[in-house]
């Protein structure tokens, strides 16, 4: 008989943990080494949108150990006036809402030149973006490497837009991040696919020194000079 155990330091509730243990997806009458663990992970993720299954280990003679953790709300994408996807850093749909306003404790609104491939996704699915996916997926880890956890990221940024432009020096098309804080300050990280961790570090330092009352007059730009050095430029709005 299969003995199912869960190991997890960050379950949100005993109810969630119990629902995993009692899931009818598991083949309790099948030998341990014939269990389809990939299928279990897929089904658990779909049926429990806020759950992240890290791995499932087989332990002789009859134990499956499931290591899980909570997923955190990070991003929101507006699909229509009454349809918003709430996403984690892996772009998993945690919820579908009919309305959404970004605050310092909920998700950061994503926009700009991005489009969603699977527009009919529902809670538990993973989104695929037609453009900008790699950059969005790199943003949260880059922030964490700058010692900003998810709650701090949400407190800093109201919205993030993916934009494209022709680089004025190389004339090549490049992606950049256009970010807004809750004072309305516009911040741009140019050539965002290059040295993003360092550029975010520069942005955070410049933002900390910026006077919020100037948010309507200036914007911050994070650039790289011809020597490869990253710097912040405070530019007056036209």
Question: For the regions a protein language model found, what residue spans apply to each?
Answer:
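Charged, solvent-exposed interaction patches on well-folded alpha/beta domains
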Residues: 1, 21-43, 52-238
């Amino acid at each position: 008989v299969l003995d199912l155990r869960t190991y997890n330091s960050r379950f949100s509730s005993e109810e969630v943990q119990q629902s995993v243990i009692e899931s009818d997806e598991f083949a309790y009458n099948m030998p341990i080494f014939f269990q389809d663990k990939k299928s279990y992970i897929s089904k658990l993720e779909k049926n429990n949108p806020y759950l992240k299954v890290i791995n499932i280990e087989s332990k002789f003679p009859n134990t499956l150990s499931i290591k899980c953790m909570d997923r955190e709300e990070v991003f929101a994408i507006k699909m229509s006036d009454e349809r918003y996807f709430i996403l984690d850093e892996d772009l998993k749909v945690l919820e579908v809402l009919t309305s959404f306003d970004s605050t310092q404790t909920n998700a950061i609104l994503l926009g700009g030149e991005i489009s969603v491939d699977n527009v009919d996704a529902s809670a538990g699915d993973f989104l695929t973006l037609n453009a900008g996916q790699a950059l969005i997926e790199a943003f949260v880890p880059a922030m964490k490497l700058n010692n900003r956890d998810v709650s701090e990221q949400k407190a800093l940024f109201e919205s993030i837009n993916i934009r494209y432009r022709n680089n004025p020096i190389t004339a090549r098309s490049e992606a950049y991040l256009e970010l807004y804080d809750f004072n309305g300050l516009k911040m741009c990280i140019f050539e965002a696919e290059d040295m993003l961790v360092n550029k975010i570090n520069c942005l955070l330092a410049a933002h900390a020194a910026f006077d919020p009352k100037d948010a309507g007059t200036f914007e911050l730009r994070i650039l790289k000079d011809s020597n490869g050095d990253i710097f912040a430029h405070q530019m007056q709005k036209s």
